[in-house]
């Protein structure tokens, strides 16, 4: 914690105060924010803050002020140079300069990698497609076997005179 680093540079009593603040920070934090909001809005109603919490708020204010004083950037135009100047890269005499990639000799205009990847990809697609079609054909064979096992006896052919109307006689209304 930044506050802890500040207190280490102060006295032993300050470290004890910080330990107390850390121990009670969760319970204190919400009320301290509420206290600051009301103080900034200049509301004069009495607040439910114990004297101990008031001391803690004063300590935290003091510590934050000290931290801001110590870590304030100097005023003025922004720095244009980095803190640590960059050293120019010097190539030693032992190192060889990097050579550009040279294409292996071949009849094709395309680089070797592109040709390899195209061939490899087309072979992979072909094998995947053939596996897929083999699977579909196998499923078709299974369906034929299942159809033959579940084949139902054919229904006896009905005469043309055997209508569904005769099964369910309905009186026709005549007007």
Swiss-Prot record:
Regulation: induction: Expressed in the late phase of the viral replicative cycle.
Coiled-coil boundaries: none
Record key words, sorted: Late protein, Virion
Chief site of localization: virion
Keyword Cytoplasm: no
Subcellular location: Virion
GO cellular component: virion component
Biased composition (Low complexity): 94-105
Claim: Cell division is one of the keywords in the record: no
Cysteine-cysteine disulfides: none
Region (Disordered): 68-112, 153-175
Residues making up the signal peptide according to the UniProt record: none
Family: Belongs to the asfivirus H171R family.
Listed name of the protein: Uncharacterized protein H171R
């Amino acid at each position: 914690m930044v506050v802890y680093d500040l207190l280490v540079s102060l006295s032993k009593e300050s470290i004890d105060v910080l330990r107390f603040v850390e121990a009670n920070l969760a319970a204190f934090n919400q009320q301290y924010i509420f206290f600051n909001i009301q103080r900034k809005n200049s509301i004069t109603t009495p607040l439910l803050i114990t004297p101990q919490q008031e001391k803690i708020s004063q300590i935290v204010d003091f510590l934050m002020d000290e931290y801001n004083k110590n870590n304030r950037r100097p005023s003025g135009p922004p720095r244009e140079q980095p803190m640590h100047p960059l050293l120019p890269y010097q190539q030693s005499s032992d190192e060889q300069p990097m050579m550009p990639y040279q294409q292996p000799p071949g009849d094709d205009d395309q680089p070797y990698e592109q040709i390899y990847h195209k061939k490899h990809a087309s072979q992979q697609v072909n094998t995947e497609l053939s596996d897929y079609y083999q699977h579909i054909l196998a499923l078709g064979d299974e369906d034929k076997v299942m159809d033959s096992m579940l084949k139902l006896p054919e229904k006896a052919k009905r005469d043309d005179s055997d209508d569904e109307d005769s099964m369910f006689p309905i009186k026709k209304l005549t007007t």
